[in-house]
């Protein structure tokens, strides 16, 4: 699933491709992608102009004229790309926005898990996906005091806690494995048992890793591409994710992989301390 750096990279690369364009028509090949009534979705967006694209957590927020916002969640495999309307339809393309300038934006999704929800601008944080999201890294809301307090109330392990989007939004499996290794915290550690100084380390590592990964245009380990069809660069900087069975770059111990709540989790059994 694209995590915050990947979704932000999609936003940055997609914006210059579609900003200022007006929708002439919309073709929906797979209606379940649309949360609204598909006919109403088409009717409301036809002749509307894309003003800009914002992002919150892993959600893209397409801002349209007449105070409309399309909340787009890419989920596991969602991708946007610009084509000409006569371009042959791909097997996994499910929605097409045809613009008045003769170009078209298509949404492709192999697993069909992605969703688009049209709402009034200003109400997007009331939608099901965004309503309960916690703060983003590198924001005032995500303070070290907030983070220490949030973890002190969590009985579950730290891996699951960091994946909980109500605690901090935008992190996924890749970056959680990385920041726990950087902070030398075992993924099965009880969140509330981690010492305050280690939580501070973890806090700074989260902010730094998200910043660097975004600068590197995200991580491509499976199918992730930006709006230009380019891969990310942070996969070349990964220390543990995808490196199970290799030596830890800190101590030389062989990295191990376990399942944590069904998620593959790679860690160093020597460097990463288990707090119970």
From Swiss-Prot:
UniProt gene name: mutM
Catalytic reaction annotation: Hydrolysis of DNA containing ring-opened 7-methylguanine residues, releasing 2,6-diamino-4-hydroxy-5-(N-methyl)formamidopyrimidine; 2'-deoxyribonucleotide-(2'-deoxyribose 5'-phosphate)-2'-deoxyribonucleotide-DNA = a 3'-end 2'-deoxyribonucleotide-(2,3-dehydro-2,3-deoxyribose 5'-phosphate)-DNA + a 5'-end 5'-phospho-2'-deoxyribonucleoside-DNA + H(+)
Zinc finger (FPG-type): 239-273
Protein name in the entry: Formamidopyrimidine-DNA glycosylase
Subunit architecture: Monomer.
Active-site residue numbers: 2 (schiff-base intermediate with dna), 3 (proton donor), 58 (proton donor), 263 (proton donor)
Family label: Belongs to the FPG family.
Gene3D superfamilies named in the record: 1.10.8.50, MutM-like, N-terminal
Residues the record lists as binding DNA: 92, 111, 154
Enzyme nomenclature, EC number: 3.2.2.23, 4.2.99.18
SS bond list: none
Keywords: DNA damage, DNA repair, DNA-binding, Glycosidase, Hydrolase, Lyase, Metal-binding, Multifunctional enzyme, Zinc, Zinc-finger
Family matches, as InterPro entries: DNA_glyclase/AP_lyase_DNA-bd, DNA_glyclase_Znf_dom_DNA_BS, Formamido-pyr_DNA_Glyclase, FPG_cat, MutM-like_N-ter, Ribosomal_uS13-like_H2TH, Znf_DNA_glyclase/AP_lyase, Znf_FPG/IleRS
Cofactor: Zn(2+)
Molecular-function GO term, any one: 8-oxo-7,8-dihydroguanine DNA N-glycosylase activity
